[in-house]
């Protein structure tokens, strides 16, 4: 069982015209979880659901982007794709000695896989999302710069009935002239597969846009026999061994200021 501190906190940091807010609070009450599950037409939600946790990046003009569990779960594809069914069948085979091995595949994505990339903020003005050939300068990110602000927020986590883990978390670090955010969905179904959906967001203070890069990686465990099993539980370590399934590169342009 993964242990997490549930101490509530509300951290704010100003970066030029941006206000960064990280709200961390307790797990949702079961009654609220049940109500939300009903609204989303899902039989159940992750066992650790932090529905009020949020990481928000908002400009003084009102536009911006935030990351929260509710919106992330809204884009979980609950129609059964072939990958999901095949995965569930393998999962059942992998626990054939279990009394539950004959259970019916549930009519929802029990892995909570989400390709969520954030929620755009603003009533009159919003960030304009366009495809781009520009890339986040990873070399610059490796340079040793002073960290002005750092926060990590867990959005949800589920241990898949002790057969792995599904989690979504977001962290941000602010340097003197830029900020970098990583939203990570990590899934491990023991004996079956590992999947990672990463969204990276980067902004330099003198630019009028953010760069957003989404990368989806996945591998069956059977194809990872060359990797030491202890790495299966370490997203940062296992990432390099997972083949890239999809990439999306976008520029989030700031809206024109009203005159």
UniProtKB/Swiss-Prot annotation:
Instruction: List GO BP terms, alphabetically.
Output: TOR signaling
Keywords assigned by UniProt, alphabetized: Cytoplasm
Q: Name one GO molecular function term.
A: protein phosphatase activator activity
Concerning Pfam families, the annotation shows:
TIP41
Q: Where is the signal peptide?
A: none
Classification via InterPro entries: Phosphatase_reg/MetRdx, TIP41-like
GO-annotated cellular components:
cytosol
Entry's localization field? Cytoplasm
Q: Which domain of life is it from?
A: Eukaryota
- Family label: Belongs to the TIP41 family.
| Biological function | May be a regulator of serine/threonine-protein phosphatases 2A (PP2A) and 4 (PP4).
The protein, known as: TIP41-like protein
């Amino acid at each position: 069982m993964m242990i997490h501190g549930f101490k509530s906190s509300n951290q704010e940091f100003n970066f030029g015209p941006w206000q960064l807010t990280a709200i961390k609070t307790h797990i949702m009450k079961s009654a609220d979880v049940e109500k939300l599950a009903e609204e989303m037409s899902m039989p159940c939600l992750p066992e650790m659901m932090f529905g009020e946790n949020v990481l928000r990046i908002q400009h003084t003009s009102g536009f911006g982007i935030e990351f929260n569990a509710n919106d992330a779960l809204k884009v979980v594809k609950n129609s059964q794709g072939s990958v999901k069914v095949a995965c569930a069948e393998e999962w059942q085979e992998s626990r054939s000695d279990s009394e539950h091995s004959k259970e019916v595949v549930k009519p929802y994505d029990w892995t909570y896989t989400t390709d969520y990339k954030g929620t755009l903020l603003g009533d009159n003005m919003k960030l304009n999302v366009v495809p781009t050939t520009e890339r986040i300068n990873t070399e610059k990110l490796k340079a040793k710069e002073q960290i002005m602000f750092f926060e990590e927020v867990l959005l949800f986590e589920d241990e898949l009935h002790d057969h792995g883990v599904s989690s979504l978390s977001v962290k941000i670090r602010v340097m003197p002239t830029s900020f970098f955010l990583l939203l990570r969905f990590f899934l491990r179904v023991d004996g079956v597969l590992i999947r990672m959906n990463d969204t990276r967001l980067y902004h330099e203070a003198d630019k009028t846009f953010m760069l957003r890069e989404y990368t989806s990686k996945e591998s069956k465990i059977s194809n990872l026999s060359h990797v030491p099993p202890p790495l299966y539980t370490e997203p940062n370590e296992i990432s390099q061994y997972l083949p890239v399934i999809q990439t999306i590169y976008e520029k989030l342009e700031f809206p024109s200021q009203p005159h």
